[in-house]
Amino acid sequence: MVFQQFALLPHLTTIENVAFPLDVQGVKKEVREARALEVIELVGLKGRENYYPRQLSGGQQQRVGIARSLVVEPDLWFLDEPFSALDPLIRREMQDEFIRLQNLLKKTIVFITHDFDEAIRLADRIAVMKDGEIEQIADPEQLVLDPATDYVAEFTRHVSRAKVIKAATIMSPIKKDQFGGEVAHDATIEEIADQVEGSKFPHKVMRDGQVIGQIDSSAVVNILVGRD
């Protein structure tokens, strides 16, 4: 588990904080320190093993917290607003680090946040909760395009549709034999906007190596300016 407050022990070094869960489990010192060194390197803190928390920045302290949660090799990784106490630049950096670790480790992750933009950037599926009850579970695109309740609609009202709508959602059937390029079916409009807008020809929409439709600049612009 990783929490909003890092809860590092101030009298312990980085390696001692990271190895602490293994110490509690009774793992031998040489084994727990070897494992701690592995995850310290994994989260980008190699060379800071003997630093105390007061010698680390906020982002570095959160990396120690992340390393500590990974040292026991959990099957389920639970993060409760882990980046909300960080300033915007460091927060973005930690989100990038989170994505890198997820791509590397392939763990099941439950990530708690009040920031919907953070949720759509990090999550495959999102559960929107109100008063302790789940209002809707869906992928980001479905939450924005087909909200199940008024609360979900209001919660997602201000999100940029270009961040969640995918090429396959607004593509049209193949009509021409001249194209400006290809885009993935699951790429968001934000990701393909520059590529498609800059071409006078439509782009093929691809899935598993097959052409499933086309998308042109007018369809992309409609989403960018908020026209359905």
Regions found by a protein language model. Name each.
Residues 77-80:
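Catalytic Walker B motif of ABC-type/P-loop ATPase nucleotide-binding domains
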Residues 178-210, 214-228:
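The conserved cystathionine-beta-synthase
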Residues 12-19:
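Short coil-to-helix segment of the ABC ATPase nucleotide-binding domain corresponding to the Q-loop/switch region
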